[in-house]
Amino acid sequence: MKSSEIRQKFLQFFQSKGHTIVPSSSLVPANDPTLLFTNSGMVQFKDVFTGKEARAYKRATSSQRSVRAGGKHNDLENVGYTARHHTFFEMLGNFSFGDYFKREAIQYAWELLTQVYRLPAEKLWVTVYQEDDEAYDIWAKEVGVPAERIIRIGDNKGARYASDNFWQMADTGPCGPCSEIFYDHGPEIWGGPPGSLEEDGDRYIEIWNLVFMQFERDAAGNMERLPKPCVDTGMGLERIAAVLQHVHSNYEIDLFQKLIAAAARETGVKDLADNSLKVIADHIRACAFLIVDGIIPSNEGRGYVLRRIVRRALRHGYKLGQTKPFFHRLVPDLVAEMGEAYPELAQVAERVAQVLRQEEKRFGETLEHGMKILDGALAKVAKGDPLDGTTLFTLYDTYGFPVDLTADICRERGVEVDMAGFEAAMQRQREQARAAGKFKMAEGLSYEGAETRFEGYESLELSGVKVTALYVEGTQVEQVSAGQDAVVVLDATPFYAESGGQVGDTGLLEAGGVRFAVADTLKIQPGVFGHHGTLEAGALKVGDTLLARVDAVRRARTVRNHSATHLMHKALREVLGAHVQQRGSLVDPDKTRFDFAHDAPMTAEQIARVEAIVNAEVLANQATEAKVMAYDDAVKGGAMALFGEKYGDTVRVLDIGFSRELCGGTHVRRTGDIGLFKVVSEGGVAAGVRRIEAITGDNALAWVQDQNVLLQRAAGVLRAPAHELPERIAQVQEQLKALEKELEQARTKLAASAGNDLAATATVEVKGIKVLAASIGDVDPKALRGMVDNLKDRLKPAVVLLAAGSADGKISLVGGVTADLTGRIKAGDLVGFVAGQVGGKGGGRPDMAMGGGTDLAALPAAVASVQKWVDERL
């Protein structure tokens, strides 16, 4: 059975059991700072399990793209060396949100494995938590698994509920026992059943984990039963495929065999069992899907993990003898294997290959040199000693070698690495990274009240709003006094809280003698708006009723920029291509700053086309329309979902002109309200990411007027109409070039004339050699050199030293020696001798040298010393 069939049968089976098939979520967890990458099927349902989010369904099934590389869950160093470790894998799962529980979960799993996949029942073993009699009885009495193949696993990790068969999301929160299903490969494979001393062998392989969330654990460790227990299951596609295809290693399944063959093709390797081919085949999956989800190789965060994986693959290619770019050529093979299941891969395949090709080129420039440095360092390491941290850091900092890549190479050579030394060298960078990753001060404030009702789509002023919480310096208080900075939470507000790149509103909260100036609005928790500012007058208490008034002018400017951003995004995709995806944005009253995926600078023509498209939509003055609908319906209707944003089952869809996006921000009523759109800058911010800044409305008008003033001034200076300025400037440039050429010719003639005079008046003879040393005023260094060349030809055999002092106090020196004398006198030595006396340095060839200095007062004596210096050397 092919891997694609296994995946399809799994989803179809659970769909037949009333489950909704939910597409794989992004590898970038939405709004979850605790995870670097999505690493299991339950990640996208985390808020559903904890009760923070409701879905339209209670049963779900998915095939979730997952990555374990970096952070707590990191399999990177084992990939390629074991049968079952991967950076990228697919997790098949079924989930119940307070619907069915253990009985159905166990029965569904058994039915799928034995009736759909037709695995022999006698090959399946199960484990249950030691105290989970309910699960044990279902397996034994209802499913009919013999007692000898049901194993109870207790608290085997040193603490209460610390067990391979007890799962918990965190130290507190939902948790519960789990039941794992194992497949017995048979006695010809070494290993024992789970819980035995030989459990680490490959005979008994876990293929499915059924988690039963039935408790809520508090900070004291107390367990309370959940009123609506849930089910979370996970089965690795690669593992079940190995079982169904009768192989013992995941790398032997059909999907990997085709990728390994492709890697062998691109590296010229004949031995398909080579571990390096396994590494490359695994890594192309992780790298491609990370790029699909918007991650670009970089030196921080998720981008750095991607860079590490790419470079590890390239290093293994280099190890196989492939020193030219090859990794990106595996993308079509990956699309052939996985593009049907994940159409998002096929849609951006060209972009994926392009990003990988650029990273290959970037690393290829340093790989060979870095390997020489590493090989040299390893050759000096004494037996039993580690590679020092300084070398590790040099390879990382100078040659782009991720430290785990270096450690990987060292492991192959039997050498440990000095991680402590490396960490010491990295301390400053780590501190900077930690500082950059901190939350804003307002986020995460303790709050247990109702969410804030947002009324700001329709109104900028709202009376009768009630204060539900107050905070001063992060501490919840009952009252705020005049002059204090504070955060105010209201039951309802017209103030927009910063989200989706749009800045928060400012304005006033007032009542009687109370006046609170709102400087910013942020969400302190999902759905809870914190109004940051200063109490300018009065005393403010929890429970007070206020009038909330948004700064209307500032909001109007902000919404113009936000609506223009939507139109610009659509226009960029039309002009540059569908690969353009938002990578970040900032929308404030002054501008819109938009980061997007694109690999080359935009041309002036492309920018002009974007401006024309957006302004055409503005002039059309179409009404904007916002609708609330189901997420699936919105996407089917063509709404664009933005990278990195988290969406619930119900979303707000904004139609503005020819653009349709999911957006919770505030916008203009009609496109004409934008007034005018103008791009003011375009540039790169990272590899594969460009940034546009644009302005709208009165800001755009003021910018155009300022440009017009500058244009008119330039026209006045050049005495030409504005529309003729390009031609007039070109004429002036040509005239300038001609004048510069004439000036150069005049200088040359003047220098020749001066040289003739010098030859006649300043030359002395020393032991049959003509010596000329003179200072000739302010002469261009280039002309000075020409004079020395002419004098050498005229006086030979000769030694010539000319000096020129400029008006700004700089001295230029040029020395020349005819070829027949360079065996005894070097021009470089001569110039160095003179330059040292005037506070400078000099040097050059034996026959011609240049130098300089700054001490004009010492120049006459320095020039006069040349004759004696030459005499001493002849």
From Swiss-Prot:
Its EC number is 6.1.1.7. PROSITE patterns: AA_TRNA_LIGASE_II_ALA. GO terms for biological process: alanyl-tRNA aminoacylation; negative regulation of DNA-templated transcription. Consists of three domains; the N-terminal catalytic domain, the editing domain and the C-terminal C-Ala domain. The editing domain removes incorrectly charged amino acids, while the C-Ala domain, along with tRNA(Ala), serves as a bridge to cooperatively bring together the editing and aminoacylation centers thus stimulating deacylation of misacylated tRNAs. Binds 1 zinc ion per subunit. GO terms for cellular component: cytosol. PANTHER family: ALANINE--TRNA LIGASE, CYTOPLASMIC, ALANYL-TRNA SYNTHETASE. It is found in: Cytoplasm. Its cofactor is Zn(2+). It catalyses: tRNA(Ala) + L-alanine + ATP = L-alanyl-tRNA(Ala) + AMP + diphosphate. Zn(2+) binds at residues 562, 566, 663, 667. It holds the Pfam family tRNA_SAD. SUPFAM superfamilies: Class II aaRS and biotin synthetases (SSF55681), Putative anticodon-binding domain of alanyl-tRNA synthetase (AlaRS) (SSF101353), ThrRS/AlaRS common domain (SSF55186), Translation proteins (SSF50447). HAMAP family: Ala_tRNA_synth_B. One of its GO terms (molecular function) is ATP binding. Keywords: Aminoacyl-tRNA synthetase, ATP-binding, Cytoplasm, Ligase, Metal-binding, Nucleotide-binding, Protein biosynthesis, RNA-binding, tRNA-binding, Zinc. Catalyzes the attachment of alanine to tRNA(Ala) in a two-step reaction: alanine is first activated by ATP to form Ala-AMP and then transferred to the acceptor end of tRNA(Ala). Also edits incorrectly charged Ser-tRNA(Ala) and Gly-tRNA(Ala) via its editing domain. This is Alanine--tRNA ligase. Belongs to the class-II aminoacyl-tRNA synthetase family. It comes from the Bacteria.
